C-alpha cells in the first residue's frame, strides 16, 4: 500500500474507489495498491 498525495491508476485493471472520503486504488497487482493521504 502506497500512501500518496495524488493517486493515479497505473494499469487498466486499477480501480479508483472512494471510501469514507479517501481515494483508494485497488488492483490485481498488489504493487499498484494506493491510498490518498
Swiss-Prot record:
GO molecular function: structural constituent of ribosome
Pfam families on file: Ribosomal_L36 (PF00444)
PROSITE patterns hit by this protein: RIBOSOMAL_L36
Keywords: Ribonucleoprotein, Ribosomal protein
GO cellular component, one term: ribonucleoprotein complex
Domain of life of the organism encoding this protein: Bacteria
Keyword Ribosomal protein: yes
A Gene Ontology biological process term: translation
Matches recorded under InterPro entries: Ribosomal_bL36, Ribosomal_bL36_sp
Matches recorded under SUPFAM superfamilies: Ribosomal protein L36
Assigned protein family: Belongs to the bacterial ribosomal protein bL36 family.
Protein name per the record: Large ribosomal subunit protein bL36
Annotated organism of origin: Borreliella burgdorferi (strain ATCC 35210 / DSM 4680 / CIP 102532 / B31) (Borrelia burgdorferi)
Name of the gene this protein is made from: rpmJ
Amino acid at each position: 500500500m502506497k500512501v500518496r498525495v495524488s493517486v493515479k491508476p497505473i494499469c487498466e485493471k486499477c480501480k479508483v474507489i472512494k471510501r469514507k472520503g479517501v481515494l483508494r486504488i485497488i488492483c490485481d497487482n498488489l504493487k499498484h495498491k494506493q491510498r490518498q493521504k
